[in-house]
Amino acid sequence: MSVRRTVAGPIRIRGRGLHSGSPLTLRIHPYGEGIVFRCAGESVRAHPGNVTGTFRATTLGGISTIEHLMSAFAAASVSSALVELTAPEVPGLDGSARGFADAIAEAGTTVLGPAPQRVVGGTVTVRGGPTSIVIRPGTGRWSCTYDLGERWPGALTVRATLPGEYGAAVAWARTCVLAEEIPQARRAGLGGGLDSGSVVIIGPDGYANPVRAPDEPARHKLLDLIGDLWLAGVPLDLMDVTAIRPGHSTGVRAAALLARQWPEDAVR
């Protein structure tokens, strides 16, 4: 039986915005009506229909970079929480979801009651150029390929059974960037909260800084995909997912297709 789950107690996390670099505080409160982000009087529900941007991050309304926190929520099966922010961006922390996952584990979770069963009714496929995401009813077998073609490191593939292996295989993987993209990202005002310890820099023939695993970029892409798909609220262990070069745009499109299976769960 599916259940609605929230955090068992309040959580406070301080950090800097992943892209803005501005200091901010995030507070997570027990809540009973889905996942809601709130900042400066704006409240927006976590749902693919409320996504307003997918460039380098997933943005809900005016609140950006929600995917790492959403990924940690998915792994802990947290389907309801009130997330309050002092600035319209989720903290970047170390570039991964580990800080969020650890904070949720420390606070614990509690069951609110039964929830409508979110079962994938058939194969969901999203394609766009070299990118593809295929979702089938399943038991939590996930595969993600990070593929730069002829550019180093070529193709990296990671597989995990979720949510059980999330902490060991996914949560700690940091965001990644191509070395040649850094100047452009800085000019666009992105990555201001990242440093060499919180991002994997991919050079033309090797990593430009220490990595936590040789396939860390693929693991982070899986982390992001988990967060984007959690917008549809399907438990991780009820899907088998195969993704090749996923990005936030295709991840949110896939979440939207999943969410269409439950029209009663309308955007609000």
Regions found by a protein language model. Name each.
Residues 1-268:
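Short acidic-hydrophobic catalytic motif
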